[in-house]
Amino acid sequence: MEVGSEEEKWEKLDAEFDHFVVDMKPFVLKLPHRTERQRCALWIRKLCEPSGTGAGIMGRKNRNLYAKLLLHMLKRGALEGPFTHRPEPGTLKILPSYMSIYFDEPNPARAKGSSPEGLPAWVLGELETSEHKLNESWKLSSGEDNTLVQSPTDVYSREQYTGKLRVRSHSLSPTHREDGQNITPKICEVYSKKSPVSLDDSDIEARLNSWNLGIENPRYLRQKPIPVSLMTPKFSLRKSSSFHDDHFLSRIREKELDMKTKMMEAKFHEEKLKLQQKHDADVQKILERKNNEIEELKTLYRSKQHETEETIRKLEKKVQTLIRDCQVIRETKEDQIAELKKICEQSTESLNNDWEKKLHNAVAEMEQEKFDLQKQHTENIQELLEDTNVRLNKMESEYMAQTQSTNHMIKELEARVQQLTGEAENSNLQRQKLIQEKAELERCYQITCSELQEVKARRNTLHKEKDHLVNDYEQNMKLLQTKYDADINLLKQEHALSASKASSMIEELEQNVCQLKQQLQESELQRKQQLRDQENKFQMEKSHLKHIYEKKAHDLQSELDKGKEDTQKKIHKFEEALKEKEEQLTRVTEVQRLQAQQADAALEEFKRQVELNSEKVYAEMKEQMEKVEADLTRSKSLREKQSKEFLWQLEDIRQRYEQQIVELKLEHEQEKTHLLQQHNAEKDSLVRDHEREIENLEKQLRAANMEHENQIQEFKKRDAQVIADMEAQVHKLREELINVNSQRKQQLVELGLLREEEKQRATREHEIVVNKLKAESEKMKIELKKTHAAETEMTLEKANSKLKQIEKEYTQKLAKSSQIIAELQTTISSLKEENSQQQLAAERRLQDVRQKFEDEKKQLIRDNDQAIKVLQDELENRSNQVRCAEKKLQHKELESQEQITYIRQEYETKLKGLMPASLRQELEDTISSLKSQVNFLQKRASILQEELTTYQGRR
């Protein structure tokens, strides 16, 4: 008996928990935040697990308390307490006692209707800051000075407050909570008692502590107690001396302020009492509602009891009718016996025939009743089998539809995978095209190098021609040397800029390598863009160097032409001067022969000095040209070394990137193949599991049908045995009747006196046999009905349990398949979005590179024009170039920041839009269908429970 009672308690607690879970579902779905929904789902799962709740009655009660508290908080719309965090592993902790306050809270709709302003003033005061509280207390104390004099009413209100607090502490205890009708008289008794109230601080603290209902460390206990003193010194201070007036007045004001604060506290407690009265009224309403529900249940129970009584009465009426029929049959039999007594002497054979007919009729009625019972039994079994077949057909149709949908989704996914592979092949083709373009650019670079060598050879020839120039080129050579130094500085600065650019590009490439590991397609596009940028920069540098060398060669040629023209002019001038001097000499020879000798000597000395000076200048020019050639050869070798090193670095970086790309492609293909294999394997396993389950169910149904058939055959055998026994008894009775008749004939012939005694004995024996037959037939009927009812109950329970198991398994499989489909859809959508984003980024970067290339072209053209026009403005042009470079850097930084912000926005949109609208709609449809199935099963379970209760009541 104790085990049965424990099982009933477990069933009641489980049913209560199921109701709580069903009531929670709409509120959980209405929660706005996804994290709260996930947390509620984790808590519900934790409560549904037997390992987390415990197996005993206390564990189930604790689980139900958690479920009730969660439902209450969901109805209220705010999660608090333990539900703000995820559930801890292990068993659930026991809820503390103060959590019962949540269950005692009134309905939010009633609370809103009761207070017109939504919240009382004391709640708003508790929420505001302490300074605002002080200001309000000052205002209220200044506006209500007239009410401070009425101290007895305040004392009485405090007495009411203390009494009310005691009543609340008693009413909220678990022992007195059921006696909801006895709350009001206790309150009246407390109001009638008026005891003197002390104004000590300890008394106030004790009352507040007694009013504390499980709330740990409330606000009014954290505040410091206010000292209370009487107002009697007010009158005595007015009669004191003037020396202490100010001091006493300040004390009086302080005491008045203390009294005002205490009066405000009293008002505050009165408002709390009013709210407590409202709360008690709400509690009383809840109790009335519960009592009404109990009365409704009682009325339902009484109606059911009345129905059962009516059925019992009907059955009793049927029994009475059967008894009457039996009495009528007995009367008819008695009449027949009397007739037989009368006609016994005339026709014993006719009497025997009548008895045989009656026995045949009784046996036929019994057989008809048995046949009807068998028909009912078979019909019930057929109905159960039809229901199970219909449900199985429905489940099979749903499973076929789901398999078709999954196959369709798999085909779509395969098509999308093929599209992605095609796009990858297109990207590979583009990469090959870029490699071809790179080879063409390298050829162009070699051609330009050969042209540069030719230009260098021409420059060497020009330098050789310069050796034959005269002393007049000293100034031009100095100018050329200054220009050459400036050009070398420019080249060094450009080389430093190119090296810094190369280092910055290497750092950017390293960062891009890190990003390539995360995203494969983005890394390919970035690599292509970086290669294009490097090639463009390399071309720009080549064109710039070409332009510089051509400009220098042109300048040298122009300077050589100018020098040749100047020398020719000077030679022509010298020739003219010599002619004039010769003419003068011929003229003066006649006049000054003596002076001629002196002039010849002076001329010879002058010639010697000129030759010496020319030789010195020529030697200095040769030394300077040799130094210039050595510097040029050094700069050439350094540039060649730097270009070779740069090319080697580029080749190493390209090889690394190509290896990384190949590895990433191989990993991507392996992951694709692995995922496809896993998907196919899971699909095959699911199909096999479904087929196995269907076969198992068919086998179970066949076994159940075989069991039912065997039971029916056993019942038939039993019925046949009973019928055979009855026929044997009837045959025995017939033989006994024949023997009795023969004995009667003999006795009539032999003994006429003993006829009456023998007749009486025969009638008595016949009645006893008939009564025995009737009792046995009634017992057999009752036993057959009981066995039939038990078998129907067992078959119903088995079918329901099997159907529940099948439904649970199919729901689990549906959830798994839906999860797999959702994951595949998310991966496909993410791949699509990444591909589109990569294409957009590539197009944008190409546009940016083109714009940069055009801007750089324009700037280089302008710089070259300015250099050709004005040599003096070189410094200004260089400063302008520096400013342009700074602007470019700022522009690049802004572009990089914009790209970073754009990538962040794209990833945020990715993360936000992971779940498409179609998937959400499908999930909502599945949730609604599951809800309808759950409601249908609940209704079915309630109907079966009612049938069981009615059957138990009949038994």
From Swiss-Prot:
One of its GO terms (biological process) is receptor localization to synapse. Its main location: cytoplasm. Residues 277-954 form a coiled coil. Pfam families: DUF4485. It is found in: Cytoplasm, Cytoskeleton, Microtubule organizing center, Centrosome. It comes from the Eukaryota. InterPro entries: CEP112, DUF4485. Keywords: Coiled coil, Cytoplasm, Cytoskeleton, Disease variant. One of its GO terms (cellular component) is centrosome. Changing R692W: In SPGF44; uncertain significance. It is linked to Spermatogenic failure 44: An autosomal recessive infertility disorder caused by spermatogenesis defects and characterized by the presence of acephalic spermatozoa in the semen of affected individuals. PANTHER family: CENTROSOMAL PROTEIN OF 112 KDA (PTHR18871:SF2). This is Centrosomal protein of 112 kDa. The lineage of its organism: Eukaryota, Metazoa, Chordata, Craniata, Vertebrata. The gene is CEP112.
